[in-house]
Amino acid sequence: MQADKSEQRAVTRLCIQCALYLLQHGAESALVEELSTRLGRALGMDSVESAISSNAIVLTTIKDGECLTSTRKNSDRGINMHVVTEVQHIVIMAEHKLLDYKDVEKRFSQIKPLRYPRWLLVLMVGLSCACFCKLNNGGWDGAVVTFFASTVAMYIRQLLTHRSMHPQINFCITAFVATTISGLMLRLPAFSETPTIAMAASVLLLVPGFPLINAVADMFKGHINTGLARWAIASLLTLATCIGVVMAMTMWGLRGWA
């Protein structure tokens, strides 16, 4: 009996760790609930119930009429689909009886978020913003302006993130830098005829697309509270970006977007 309780306690910890990994790294709430439940049942539980909010998870496992509940506080670790994929693989292996709870615990301890080199991330963000500008009739000169502005802005954003700057302040400063660089470059004689779409494209790196998509997905699938919380966070980030853009345009007297 004591051994069964000890095993249930271990499985409960693994289930809530599974849910926490997913929620911390950007998975939608329905996936968090589904995978934690599947893992618990794969490891011998009769039922797994969970309540998910934006800053905490409460999870209960039931086996032979015995309930065990655990609570964990959630902290955002940034979007990382590598972690989500790794957790999915572990759950699938447990369902196929390739892993017991001790193996799952070992696999969880080995999960490390995939991090790309900073220089590569800066380069790819600059190129993606420049391509958007070119596709929206910004021309090659507009793409050059966008590339330089968004590259520097992404570098600044990484520096501020590394120093644990508040996300809203981070986005505001980054938007200010991107708009300042692109706007002042458009004043140069070489770019005097460049469309101002370059200014808009240079702040695309700050669009919180993933949180907004997850917010809508959560609300459609019944996780209203989590969806609204994610929507509010994404809206605040968007507001901070707008403030940074307006500050730069007002300070330097830049012409508006067209």
UniProtKB/Swiss-Prot annotation:
Mode of membrane association: Multi-pass membrane protein
Lineage summary: Bacteria, Pseudomonadati, Pseudomonadota, Gammaproteobacteria, Enterobacterales
Misc. comment: YjjPB constitutes a split-type ThrE family transporter.
Oligomer and partners: The transporter is composed of YjjB and YjjP.
Molecular-function GO term, any one: transmembrane transporter activity
Organism (species): Klebsiella aerogenes (strain ATCC 13048 / DSM 30053 / CCUG 1429 / JCM 1235 / KCTC 2190 / NBRC 13534 / NCIMB 10102 / NCTC 10006 / CDC 819-56)
Annotated GO CC locations: plasma membrane
Pfam family, one: ThrE
Subcellular localization: Cell inner membrane
Annotated protein name in UniProt: Probable succinate transporter subunit YjjP
Sequence similarity: Belongs to the ThrE exporter (TC 2.A.79) family.
Signal sequence region: none
Stated role: Involved in succinate export with YjjB. Both proteins are required for export. Participates in succinate export, but also in the export of other dicarboxylates, such as fumarate and malate. Contributes to succinate production under both aerobic and anaerobic conditions, and increases fumarate and malate production during anaerobic succinate production.
Keywords of the record: Cell inner membrane, Cell membrane, Membrane, Transmembrane, Transmembrane helix, Transport
Transmembrane residue ranges: 116-137, 143-160, 171-191, 197-217, 231-251
InterPro entries (UniProt xref): ThrE-like_N, ThrE_Dicarb/AminoAcid_Exp
Domain of life, per lineage: Bacteria
Principal place of residence: membrane
GO biological process assignments: succinate transport
